[in-house]
Amino acid sequence: MKTRDSQSSDVIIIGGGATGAGIARDCALRGLRVILVERHDIATGATGRNHGLLHSGARYAVTDAESARECISENQILKRIARHCVEPTNGLFITLPEDDLSFQATFIRACEEAGISAEAIDPQQARIIEPAVNPALIGAVKVPDGTVDPFRLTAANMLDAKEHGAVILTAHEVTGLIREGATVCGVRVRNHLTGETQALHAPVVVNAAGIWGQHIAEYADLRIRMFPAKGSLLIMDHRINQHVINRCRKPSDADILVPGDTISLIGTTSLRIDYNEIDDNRVTAEEVDILLREGEKLAPVMAKTRILRAYSGVRPLVASDDDPSGRNVSRGIVLLDHAERDGLDGFITITGGKLMTYRLMAEWATDAVCRKLGNTRPCTTADLALPGSQEPAEVTLRKVISLPAPLRGSAVYRHGDRTPAWLSEGRLHRSLVCECEAVTAGEVQYAVENLNVNSLLDLRSRTRVGMGTCQGELCACRAAGLLQRFNVTTSAQSIEQLSTFLNERWKGVQPIAWGDALRESEFTRWVYQGLCGLEKEQKDAL
């Protein structure tokens, strides 16, 4: 095994989710030298495995006023700085005949106290503005919910961090912490692409690894007690609702239907699991049944809608040090300065929270880093727009007005003001790779050159290749060829990655493999094995 020379920086961030990316951006904007390490790809943990809800905070108003206030504040900030990552759909909290209508008044009052706009509307009006809603509803409240693309949001933060000097090392797994006495001064990493190992040095290391943060802390012989909660979701094959639809009751299973990009999602379940199971993302038949049964109560059209795939993620719920049983685990933001907590300097853990509050979590963590380094520059991430959101979409669309509407619309929706740099180029760049999501060859090249793409799976999260109705059936081979053309992969690697990509798609389809989904999967298998000669896929563990 080869060992590379060490690198030095001011701060090392472990974890490539939204929080880690946000910390990298904040630190870089404050003039710090930053290295971020992620064992897989960006947004492969809880960040990329949630429902993409741009919380207004209304969901938490009754049960957690502090979280509700944080959410509405960050909601308003993201609508300013991340316009190309969010869609202000608004949301409806509906009351069904089986629910307690009197809860609506409690709900509205709690929203008002948290600073959240909540307007009771007539059920008939709710049916007009959201035709998919259950017509049997007896009450509705309109709130400023929306949707956010977690992959796009994370990539934009990473891109801004890189453009301000940060080094982003994906496919690099932390194998240990480097210590000098009672101080952490770096990490040891292994590059999964080359097998090389390397020592990275910095006076501050930030553990932003989410649920895996407990394992990272153990490298320093520290104990962070986490209680993993698995949440499962289903994706519809098209967008069936235009507003976020919630049940007006205390949070429960399968009570949010979220429209996002070209699809809708129903979620989530909540199941405590053993820590040893955090990498097992299988969705069970029982969870699928719950999601379908409860989801149809929100929008009856779900009963006639094809389910595209299922997936799950694990929330990092943190117990306080004096609560070993986990009876009172927190869903709030948890910031641990291990110098104060454990007598170990140079090491900080940021965990808990939610996608909605990633920027606030990053601000807290970066403030802690700067205190240690004597850096007095203020946080500016609430005011500075992310790459892609630095001009209105209408202005960007006018710059590419001569191009076909589906291409320019989809590209600007995903990449905002960065689109004209590549979409207006030659004929090849405008050629379609993925018809379902209108992804072009130019978009693939842009992602390769700017967004840390090392594989087909990486490309999926940057461009939505393979995330449409065909689940890669018609576009995966084209995308694999382009990655080879753009010198990301060799011929042998392209074939291996194609097989890996299709197997990953199947893992999400398998829990709902009936009817059209099963027929399409069989057709995909025939195309790649029978027609293209791809070797039989590795036997799936499912």
Model region roles, listed by residue range:
Residues Q7-S9, T194-V204:
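Core beta-strand elements of the Rossmann-like FAD/NAD(P) dinucleotide-binding domain
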Residues V11-I35:
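N-terminal Rossmann-like FAD-binding beta1-loop-alpha1 element of flavoenzymes
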Residues A28-G48:
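Glycine-rich FAD pyrophosphate-binding loop
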Residues G52-Q125, I129, D255, L397-P404, ...:
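Dinucleotide-binding Rossmann-like beta1-alpha1 core, especially the glycine-rich loop
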Residues P150, D160, R225-S232, I240, ...:
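C-terminal catalytic lobe of FAD-dependent flavoproteins
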Residues N207-D221:
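Flavin (primarily FAD) binding-site architecture
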